[in-house]
Amino acid sequence: MASTRNGISKDELLPTYELQSQRDVENSGSVTSFASKISNNAAAAVLAYCLSSISMTLVNKYVVSGASWNLSFLYLAIQSFIGTVAIMVCKKAGLIQNLGLFDLKKAQTWLPISLLLVGMIYTGNKALQFLSVPVYTIFKNLTIIVIAYGEVFMVGGSVKPLALLSFGLMVLSSVVAAWADIQIATAATAKASSDSAVATLSALNAGYAWMGTNVVFSASYALGMRRVIKKTNFDNWDVMFYNNLLSVPILLLSSLLVEDWSSENLQRNFPAESRQSLVIGIFYSGVAAIFISYCTAWCVRATSSTTYAMVGALNKLPLAVAGIVFFAAPVTFGSVSAIVLGFISGLVYTWAKSTGA
């Protein structure tokens, strides 16, 4: 507290601009201190990562769940464009310090990885269009198995017993999830017309076909990126920038070639009653992709790579539950058992990676 003399405080004798300057410094210091505390807070990092990844999946599911949705290439092109613009804005604002200038040679080297990314995100969106969020989440675990054996084939080594156990649980959870899904679909179509039953089962089969293709693309992308990233010496922001930038023309050209841009089809995909929420969802998904990348790095920095892997395993449970809550996915003994098995398999795999057993 300022000292007083003759009832007049020392602050009252200072010019107004000096008082304001002192207050600005104090406020700036408190904001910096708060930001530093948040940046190093493990709980905040974990929560931000979980919320960003869960919300991204739910928003994608919402956008592609329209009865007449058939513009996935266009959706992903807009998503990648928004991501590219967001990165450039962050760089211009000084929020990203280590993003270099565009390099044509590096872009040419990275182009095959971007093609794999396009395959991964497109097949992922198509699978999410036909499958429920819990089933999609469970089957995503199969990518881990393909990556593990891909690394054994490319680099050498072997799969340890505990990792093998986790893989067995992942396969079992996927089989149980598929069985429960087919049982639910069969029961739902038993009372429907034959045409409706055939359409429902065809959509389910399409979802599993897209999911299988997505597992292959996802594993190929992860394995390929690890090799090419050593040649380009990219950091996280470089990967995000080139992935988004190079994906835009590929996705846009694909949309122009195979998708219907007529006004009638646009009206069907973006009906008036949900147009605003769909546009907001598409915009959010573009920005959220950048936010997930930041939260991933933040989580690893504030905790450890082992904790991050554990969070990834634990995150599958609330994601599956969120899919049930927001999209009314059927709750049966089979579906719940599959979710629990998938959750346990993730924990066992994380333990195997952290202990090397």
From Swiss-Prot:
**Protein keywords:** Cytoplasmic vesicle, Endoplasmic reticulum, Golgi apparatus, Membrane, Sugar transport, Transmembrane, Transmembrane helix, Transport
Chain ranges sitting on the Lumenal side read: 65-68, 129, 183-196, 260-277, 328-332
Q: Name one GO molecular function term.
A: antiporter activity
Q: Name one GO cellular component term.
A: Golgi apparatus
Organism whose genome encodes this protein: Emericella nidulans (strain FGSC A4 / ATCC 38163 / CBS 112.46 / NRRL 194 / M139)
Name of the gene this protein is made from: gmt2
Bilayer topology term: Multi-pass membrane protein
Q: How is this protein named in the record?
A: GDP-mannose transporter 2
* Stated role: Involved in the import of GDP-mannose from the cytoplasm into the Golgi lumen.
Signal sequence coordinates: none
